[in-house]
Swiss-Prot record:
Substrate binds at residues 11, 13, 60, 65, 165. NCBIfam families: dnaq (TIGR00573), dnaQ_proteo (TIGR01406), PRK05711.1 (NF004316). One of its GO terms (molecular function) is metal ion binding. Its cofactor is Mg(2+); Mn(2+). It comes from Haemophilus influenzae (strain ATCC 51907 / DSM 11121 / KW20 / Rd). The active site is at residue 160. One of its GO terms (cellular component) is cytosol. This is DNA polymerase III subunit epsilon. Pfam families: RNase_T.
Amino acid sequence: MINPNRQIVLDTETTGMNQLGAHYEGHCIIEIGAVELINRRYTGNNXHIYIKPDRPXDPDAIKVHGITDEMLADKPEFKEVAQDFLDYINGAELLIHNAPFDVGFMDYEFRKLNLNVKTDDICLVTDTLQMARQMYPGKRNNLDALCDRLGIDNSKRTLHGALLDAEILADVYLMMTGGQTNLFDEEESVESGVIRVMQEKTAEEIKSAVDFSHNLKLLQPTNDELQAHLEFLKMMNKKSGNNCLWDKRFGNNNVH
């Protein structure tokens, strides 16, 4: 059963990937990094492990993540950590940037051990790259670009590393979806300042409080901007279990 309040932001590094056929075939996971969020708050219950592969890493892959064969020589094999890893992610929503890459590798590793399990069977997988593409159509949406766009410090990211990338992705995800505090937590956020004002005041009261005497220029969104906004509201409404406050307060019939 999926726990909707528990999210694990996950990243992997590998020995390489294939340009043709299955991208994972013949390769191995060599690092897993994961950051746990419960009710959109960091718990500190993170996971990080290096794994000894059964083959050398490709030189091009080493240039990306900097993990050499010598660094992995004394690390456990995947079969030694597989069950603990499965227990850790079981029942969570996995947040992964370009999820098909990592999930493909994870399921491949499970199959090599004859484990009768697929990631989708025990987790809800959310691809944050697809989320970003919906929110920022036509723009670059890799982690570096998103950090620049959202004002997140990624200065420590000189090489790819699974735990560091998971930590950065957690920051990116929370910024893309409204911040660390859950907007829809009845006991905390709904009682907080801005949202409480939105609950107590009607749309007419808010409108009447605005001074229109200064002849401010009214900026209209483009069709592309409006569509991106609607897609964002759809995503927020889905994430909140159909509790999108914009929809509830102002009767936005476009959010479903």
